[in-house]
């Protein structure tokens, strides 16, 4: 029987080996800076740290690190987070509080330290040492190979190989995961930590006779989650709770307590390592800056000092209190729940659809939904999501523009372990179909999707989903060039525009053109609330334009070369110190300027030119009423 069972798994095993070999060969054969289109998001910090660990055996940033980085990328480490070090001394006293931590500035002014978690860079360093930047991609391939093997082994213990392989591949291929696979950042590292940890913890629940059905596997899982907590505190720290609570529900009090202690000790050890290197336990705390354009040590005469370079950034410890005590919390939370689930850029349904299938299959299973370990796993994932929305209401997706929810991505693999036992391949096929509707274009070329994330939402089903207005300034369109995001409207400094597609253009001296080719979505970000907009519109051709500002659409027929004036009611969302509205425009007809005037070399498909003025509630109350 053992031989027959092994033969059943031979096909998936061979396929997995082929995929890992092919992906590994690709990782080692590309020109990393060119193929990945240069730097993205927070890559510069992690890459520079990995290079420093690999070639210098330290985690300090000095002039030689800048020279090495510039030699590889032919540019500086744009967006790198660095901090000045501290010399820390721990003093023990005979009176409370007994222990005192004393810090003073690092006397060596020729070195700085990295302002991000260093675990990923440390583990990736051996691969970088032997394979250069390609080693980072190879590291990701091997991590994904381990994750895929754990996912398949867990599922195959409850279902036939074909069904297990279909679901496992859907979880990895029909989600946003392939894009994060080419980001030179810790996302795949954190993903694998959670996958392996939960496999070690839960495999004994589905295969009680296996060699992994031992108490040490739970402790090993706690070690990994402790490491993950250091690397990504939220949501990983929340994922430790089910390990402790499951033991306590079974009256294994000491085992649960020790599991929690191990996770805390491991996380504390890595924060301690951070303190030993830089003098700060918090890698995001202290005297920390980010750098663009010019960098420390980039002048040979020593003039490129810390004080003359970069802009300060801090972790605001007061933010959680302010967020939780705000009177706007209920309304903001309700909007964020909607965006978290079905948001156009970061939504759970479009970018983690296999997880939706896993939850649905679990809830529909009369037996699996009563399993305490599945209930605890779902509870932890749910709690992590709620925590992100409440504590990080403006940046719960991770910021920086990557597609999908970068923070929740760490918790995503835990959803795999909700999948109930069964024999059908239908859930896996459904996961592939539903996920592919939104992520197929990401899978075709993840390098393009990673560098230009705003392109993936300009066409396809994602265009039907709501825009995350609470995080207008963190949307991928901020990365678009030529500039389409954070564009000032004409001469009004209180109004900024974010053109989410290529069916409208930034304002020109005479107004803003919308396309004749289709609907355009534009975020209007204002420093004040808007009651309605006063519009003027004109076009050289007859057309019908439809305009909405988060409320009732207004349709206006334009006659050639005649200006139409009208008002559009507004309804928006309160953002981070601003008010955000989604302006939707569409023109029924279009024209090409060159074909009307041959001397005009403008080949755009234009529909109408708009000018608008926002009207505040105070102005409206003074007698400027909306038209009936």
Protein language model regions, located:
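Signature aromatic-anchored transmembrane alpha helix within multi-pass, membrane-resident enzymes
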Residues: 9-20, 215, 219-223, 240, ...
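Membrane-interface alpha helices of multi-pass inner-membrane proteins
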Residues: 50, 167-172, 212-232, 240-247, ...
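Interfacial juxtamembrane loops and adjacent helix segments
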Residues: 55-120, 127-128, 288-331
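Transmembrane-helix motifs of polytopic, lipid-linked glycan transferases
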Residues: 135-159, 196-200
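Membrane-lumen/periplasm interface segments of specific transmembrane helices
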Residues: 255-361, 378-391, 444-452
């Amino acid at each position: 029987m053992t031989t027959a069972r092994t033969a059943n798994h031979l096909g998936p095993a061979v396929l997995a080996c082929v995929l890992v070999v092919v992906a590994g060969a690709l990782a080692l054969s590309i020109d990393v800076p060119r193929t990945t289109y240069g730097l993205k998001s927070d890559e510069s910090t992690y890459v520079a740290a990995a290079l420093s660990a690999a070639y210098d055996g330290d985690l300090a940033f000095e002039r030689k690190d800048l020279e090495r980085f510039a030699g590889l990328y032919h540019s500086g480490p744009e967006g790198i987070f660095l901090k000045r070090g501290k010399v820390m001394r721990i003093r023990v006293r005979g009176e409370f509080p007994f222990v005192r931590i004393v810090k003073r500035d690092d006397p060596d002014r020729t070195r700085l330290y990295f302002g991000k978690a260093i675990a990923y860079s440390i583990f990736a360093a051996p691969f970088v040492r032997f394979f250069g930047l390609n080693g980072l991609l190879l590291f990701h391939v091997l991590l994904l190979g381990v994750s895929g093997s754990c996912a398949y082994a867990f599922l195959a213990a409850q279902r036939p190989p074909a069904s297990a392989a279909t679901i496992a591949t859907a979880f990895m291929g029909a989600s946003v995961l392939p894009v994060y696979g080419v980001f030179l950042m810790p996302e795949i590292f954190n993903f694998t930590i959670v996958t392996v940890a939960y496999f070690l913890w839960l495999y004994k629940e589905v295969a009680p006779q296996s060699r992994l059905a031992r108490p040490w596997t739970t402790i090993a899982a706690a070690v990994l989650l402790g490491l993950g907590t250091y690397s990504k505190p939220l949501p990983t720290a929340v994922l430790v709770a089910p390990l402790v609570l499951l033991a306590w529900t079974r009256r294994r009090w000491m085992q649960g307590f020790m599991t929690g202690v191990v996770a805390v000790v491991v996380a504390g050890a890595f924060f301690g390592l951070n303190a030993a290197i830089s003098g700060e336990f918090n890698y995001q705390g202290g005297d920390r800056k980010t750098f663009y354009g010019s960098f420390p040590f980039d002048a040979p005469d020593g003039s490129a000092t810390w004080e003359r370079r970069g802009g300060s950034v801090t972790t605001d410890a007061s933010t959680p209190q302010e967020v939780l005590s705000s009177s706007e919390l209920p309304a903001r939370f309700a909007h964020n729940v909607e965006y978290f689930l079905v948001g156009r850029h970061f939504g759970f349904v479009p970018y983690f659809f296999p997880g939706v299938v896993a939850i649905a299959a679990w809830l529909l299973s009369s037996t699996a939904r009563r399993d305490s370990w599945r209930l605890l796993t779902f509870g932890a994932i749910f709690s992590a999501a709620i925590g992100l929305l409440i504590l990080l209401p403006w940046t719960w997706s991770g910021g920086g523009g990557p597609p999908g929810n970068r923070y929740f991505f760490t918790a995503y693999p835990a959803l795999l372990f909700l999948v109930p036992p069964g024999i059908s391949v239908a859930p896996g096929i459904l996961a592939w179909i539903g996920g592919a509707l939104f992520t197929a274009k990401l899978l075709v070329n993840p390098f393009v999707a990673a560098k230009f994330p705003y392109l993936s939402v300009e066409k396809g089903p994602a265009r039907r989903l709501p825009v995350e207005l609470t995080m207008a300034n963190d949307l991928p369109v901020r990365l678009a060039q030529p500039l389409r995001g954070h564009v000032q409207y004409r001469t009004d400094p209180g109004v900024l525009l974010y053109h989410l597609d290529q069916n409208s253009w930034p304002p020109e001296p005479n107004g803003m053109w919308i396309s004749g080719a289709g609907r355009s979505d534009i975020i209007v970000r204002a420093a004040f609330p808007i009651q309605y907009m006063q519009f003027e519109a004109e076009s050289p051709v007859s057309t019908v334009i439809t305009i909405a500002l988060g409320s009732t659409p207004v349709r206006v027929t334009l006659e050639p070369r005649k200006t139409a004036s009208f008002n559009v009611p507004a309804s928006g969302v309160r953002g981070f110190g601003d008010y955000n509205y989604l302006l939707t425009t569409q023109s029924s007809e279009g024209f090409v300027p060159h074909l009307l005037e041959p001397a005009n070399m403008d080949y755009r498909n234009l529909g109408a030119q708009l000018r608008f003025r926002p009207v505040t509630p105070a102005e409206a109350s003074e007698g400027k009423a909306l038209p009936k």
